[in-house]
Curated annotation (Swiss-Prot):
The lineage of its organism: Bacteria, Bacillati, Cyanobacteriota, Cyanophyceae, Synechococcales. It catalyses: 3-methyl-2-oxobutanoate + (6R)-5,10-methylene-5,6,7,8-tetrahydrofolate + H2O = 2-dehydropantoate + (6S)-5,6,7,8-tetrahydrofolate. 3-methyl-2-oxobutanoate binds at residues 42-43, 86, 116. Keywords: Cytoplasm, Magnesium, Metal-binding, Pantothenate biosynthesis, Transferase. Pfam families: Pantoate_transf. This is 3-methyl-2-oxobutanoate hydroxymethyltransferase. It comes from the Bacteria. One of its GO terms (biological process) is pantothenate biosynthetic process. Pathway: Cofactor biosynthesis; (R)-pantothenate biosynthesis; (R)-pantoate from 3-methyl-2-oxobutanoate: step 1/2. The gene is panB. Mg(2+) binds at residues 42, 86, 118. The keyword Metal-binding applies. The keyword Magnesium applies. Gene3D superfamilies: Phosphoenolpyruvate-binding domains. Belongs to the PanB family.
Length: 272
């Protein structure tokens, strides 16, 4: 999957599916499910590493998880989902050179194809333009931006006229700077719907209504594995409960071999 395919999907009216992954197991599952894009998000700081925000996530951690995600795919490279990885906090806010080095490190040492960063401040736009000149595709992110949690909080954005006008202006600037798509997080659905028609690149929503060019979700939220479930991410599976019950059954079994006999294990089929 190439970034240009997503723009083509928008023109065709085809919905774009984006799911997160953080290791080889999760990426193999997401690939088998048919996701168009796999996002190695800095949300792994909360989902996997146990932090309360995304801010502590380091570039080394993002590289570690991105490499694991890329190793988990079964299909040939040309048929794999597009892999986008987040640039973590302070890897791009401190200047263009540092941003190029961070993005280059992620893409050079994995099979990821693009990076995502938050906001549309003048300094951020300069970073985006520099990255694109260096041949690194960039996905933007507006609305609720988790790396700005101490300034904006974890609450819905673009609720008043001024902030709505700003998000329209920012989306246009991200497009003009060269972004191939924009994530809109936790904004009113009617604003996202209008914004989708305002720009030519895909608008990927999360908590932004159903009328976007695509949707992105944290995979653990869909599977019901998260302890704290976001209000806009309805689980489609009681995954946490299922896992706990399965493990309890194994722990409480008087004959562990009978719970999962080796004969059945050897007959299991791989998705690859």
């Amino acid at each position: 999957m190439q970034t240009t395919e997503l723009v083509r999907f928008k023109k065709l009216g085809k919905q774009i599916s984006v799911l997160t992954a953080w290791d080889a197991i999760s990426s193999s599952i997401v690939e088998a499910a048919g996701a168009d894009v796999v996002l190695v998000g800095d949300s792994l700081g909360m989902v996997v590493l146990g932090h309360s925000t995304t801010l502590p996530v380091t570039l080394d951690q993002m590289l570690h998880h991105t490499k694991a995600v890329c190793r988990g795919f079964c299909k040939p490279l040309s048929k794999q989902p597009l892999v986008v990885c987040d640039l973590p906090f302070l890897s791009y806010q401190c200047g263009e050179d540092k941003a190029v080095e961070a993005a280059g490190t992620l893409l050079k040492n994995s099979t990821a194809s693009a990076v995502k960063l938050e906001g549309a401040e003048p300094e951020t736009l300069l970073v985006i333009k520099r990255l694109i000149r260096m041949g690194i595709p960039v996905m933007g992110h507006l609305g609720l931006t988790p790396q700005s949690v101490h300034q904006l909080g974890y609450k819905s954005q673009a609720r008043d006229k001024d902030s709505q006008e700003k998000i329209f202006k920012d989306s246009k600037m991200l497009q003009e700077s060269g972004c191939f798509a924009i994530v809109l997080e936790h904004i009113p659905g009617e604003i996202a719907s209008r914004l989708k028609k305002h720009i030519d690149i895909p608008v990927i929503g999360i908590g932004a209504g159903n009328d976007c060019d695509g949707q992105v979700r944290v995979t653990a939220d869909i599977l019901g594995l998260s302890i704290a479930q976001p209000p806009f991410a309805k689980p489609l599976l009681a995954g946490r409960e299922l896992c706990i019950n399965a493990l309890k059954e194994w722990i409480n079994s008087t004959d562990l071999d009978q719970v999962n006999p080796t004969t059945k294990t050897s007959e299991s089929k791989s998705d690859c």
